[in-house]
UniProtKB/Swiss-Prot annotation:
Methylates arginine residues in proteins such as histone H4. The record marks F340 as: Critical for specifying symmetric addition of methyl groups. This is Protein arginine N-methyltransferase 5. The gene is PRMT5. The keyword Methyltransferase applies. The active site is at E449, E458. It comes from Oryza sativa subsp. indica (Rice). It catalyses: L-arginyl-[protein] + 2 S-adenosyl-L-methionine = N(omega),N(omega)'-dimethyl-L-arginyl-[protein] + 2 S-adenosyl-L-homocysteine + 2 H(+). S-adenosyl-L-methionine binds at Y337, K346, Y347, E405, D433, M434. PROSITE patterns: SAM_MT_PRMT (PS51678). Residues 321-627 form the SAM-dependent MTase PRMT-type domain.
């Protein structure tokens, strides 16, 4: 039974499982499953094979249960396989190593036969796990629907001794082992397989928040919450520390399922449940020993705020790679216009900026005698025309509007709007590319919405430089400036989605994407800034910058899959618009961030800065970006000469 109802959330994190610690021999598995389901758990993490089994010639695999004891849907929906923990593919003992390989392959084959969705692999037993990864990589190449979840403890622990005999090399005594490093080594050896995921063991102590944050960019499918991580409240019930609660909420928001594991450490009477937990009130006679822990997890889930309306609208776009618009080369479709026009926040900001500009342009004494000439370049279907006229009405200023639009289909709608609203005497429609049109008079105010996710990536500088000839020497441009920003991120899902194309071109393309399963590794830094009117209209719009990002020391090492890009625009004076995380305009959805991927992810050791170079290049027919990392290790220069991705003029 799901943990509860949270408006807008349909993710897998609503389901909670329980780990079966003892091998369910014979026909016990159906009873164990039935008991768990009746106690409101949704699935089992269960061993598939007797832990005492060692392969011998001619022996039959001692499985937990015949495939007939559960129906196909039960196996698929309610069982996650647990691979035997004695398996050690990097052991010095050759027989143990060979037995481990045979058994692992047999267990995975049995799980595939049962049509399980996932199996949990035991954690690496030492930091060097190359043979373990090699065997798993072989297995992954033969899988289709089965995912393998590598179990990793969520901790920074003392270094493991290679021989497990308690003796430690003195040279390593001062170091700590970051379990993220085990995962990173393993997934690199397995070539970033999209079917290799993580199951995190959540213990009683947690690393720093920055260190934890790395995992939100990784393919974490389950958080295995140990019962010894729970505290006891005043009523004797299990509860979690504030830090554990925050982590759990983060998991829920990232579609991570919780699995409760361990023995019950709380002697709670079977009669009561936590207040507000109406979904978990089954007959106490059959309740599971770990039900009090489930009740608490459900309580945490149910008290989360509903997903905001904007998040619900955007949920299907999460981590979905889209090509940026080419507004100069292509004419937008009606559906695209409609989506943008629903963003009332954006047009409210434009109206505020235009109103301030009108008041500055025309004093109260000149209101009755002065008419302001305003040009909307790239008028689309008219939302900026409407915002301009509303600003004029609000401020009591007279306005003459030129609406310039190159898309003949949008011009048809624009004519209908002007006629419907009775604006024929106020608005002149120009069906032309702004770069070709010769204006009959100069404008006091030039208004445009040519901004892309990276500010200048939809060629606003080129368009406005061409339209600047319409503007009076003391005229006002809205926007007056815009700046792009980037930050390094971990984004395993985006990397794997791009890798699936199996070519370089897709790794040299910038994508618009609603970022979700990512880890932000360092604060954003500014990249390029453009001002309008351009004080040097004949100057090139080419740009180059070099940035150095310092990752907080407590984060530890990390893997950079690329750079997230944003913009912030000054519309006029103190009215701004943007998506840069620190200053983002609330409740605006016209722009998702842009993502610049790296062909090969860059490993960044702890305390090591990242140095990145960005170029904005201009040619006769196109504009493109190039980017490269030079520290801590050099990457190729991506998209050299615009060979893979460009914006056409």
């Amino acid at each position: 039974m799901p943990l509860g109802q949270r408006a807008g959330d349909k993710s897998e994190s609503r389901y909670c499982g329980v780990e079966v610690l003892d091998f369910p021999a014979g026909e016990e598995l159906p009873a164990v499953l039935s008991h768990s389901l009746s106690s409101s758990f949704d699935f089992l993490l269960a061993p598939l094979v007797d832990p005492d089994y060692r392969p011998t010639p001619g022996s039959v695999l001692p499985v937990a249960a015949s495939d007939l004891v559960l129906g196909p849907a039960q196996w698929s929906s309610h069982i996650v396989g647990k691979i035997n923990e004695w398996i050690d593919l990097d052991a010095e003992d050759e027989q143990l190593r060979l037995d481990s390989e045979i058994t692992l392959k047999q267990e995975i084959a049995w799980a595939s036969h049962l049509s399980l969705q996932a199996c949990v692999l035991p954690p690496p037993k030492r930091s060097s796990c190359a043979n373990y990864a090699r065997v798993v990589n072989h297995i992954l190449q033969g899988l289709t629907n089965l995912q393998l979840w590598l179990r990793i403890p969520l901790e920074k622990s003392e270094p493991m001794d290679e021989d497990h005999d308690g003796a430690k090399d003195n040279s390593d005594m001062s170091d700590t082992v970051d379990s993220w490093e085990w995962w990173n080594s393993f997934r690199l050896l397995c070539e970033h397989s999209s079917q290799l995921c993580v199951a995190l063991d959540v213990l009683s102590t947690l690393p720093s928040m920055n260190s934890l944050g790395r995992w939100f960019g990784e393919p974490v499918r389950a958080a295995i919450l140990q019962t010894n991580a729970f505290l006891t409240n005043a009523r004797g019930y299990p509860c979690l520390s504030k830090r554990h609660q925050k982590l759990l909420t983060g998991f829920f928001n990232h579609s991570v399922q919780v699995i409760i594991s361990g023995r019950s450490n709380h002697n709670v009477s079977q009669g009561g449940v936590l207040s507000g937990d109406e979904n978990h009130t089954e007959d106490t006679a059959v309740r599971h020993a770990l039900s009090p822990y489930l009740d608490y997890i459900a309580y945490i889930y149910q008290r989360m705020d509903p997903l905001p309306e904007q998040e619900r609208f955007e949920i299907n776009y999460r981590d979905f790679l889209q090509s940026p618009l080419q507004p100069l080369m292509d004419n937008l479709e009606a559906q695209t216009y409609e989506t943008f026009e629903k963003d009332t926040v954006k047009y409210t900001q434009y109206q505020r900026a235009i109103a301030k500009a009108l008041v500055d342009r025309v004093s109260d004494d000149d209101v009755s005698t002065t008419k302001t000439v305003l040009m909307v370049v790239g008028a689309g279907r008219g939302p900026l025309v409407r915002a301009s006229l509303q600003a004029a009405e609000e401020t009591g200023r007279k306005l003459k509007v030129y609406a310039v639009e190159k898309n003949p289909n949008a011009v048809i709608t624009l004519h209908s709007l002007i006629k419907l609203e009775g604006w024929e005497s106020l608005v002149t429609i120009i069906s032309s590319d702004m770069r070709c049109w010769e204006a009959p008079e100069k404008a006091d105010i030039l208004v445009s919405e040519l901004l892309g996710s990276f500010g200048d990536n939809e060629l606003s500088p080129e368009c406005l430089d061409g339209a600047q000839r319409f503007l009076k020497p003391d005229g006002i441009s809205i926007p007056s400036s815009y700046t792009s920003f980037i930050e390094p991120i971990t984004a395993s899902k985006l990397h794997n989605d791009i890798k699936a194309h199996k070519d370089i071109a897709h790794f040299e393309t910038a994508y618009v994407v609603k970022l979700h399963r990512i880890a932000r590794l360092a604060p954003t830094q500014s990249v390029f800034t453009f001002d309008h009117p351009n004080p040097s209209p004949n100057a090139s719009n080419q740009r180059y910058t070099k940035l150095k990002f310092e990752i907080p020391q407590e984060t530890g090492s990390c893997l950079v899959h690329g750079f997230a890009g944003y913009f912030d625009a000054v519309l006029y004076k103190d009215v701004h618009l943007g998506i840069e995380p620190n200053t983002a305009t609330p409740n605006m959805f016209s722009w998702f961030p842009i993502f610049f991927p790296l062909r090969k992810p860059i490993y960044v050791p702890s305390k090591t800065p990242i140095e990145v170079h960005f170029w904005r290049c201009c040619g006769a027919t196109k504009v493109w970006y190039e980017w490269a990392v030079t520290a801590p290790s050099p990457s190729p220069i991506h998209n050299s000469n615009g060979r893979s991705y460009w914006v056409g003029l």
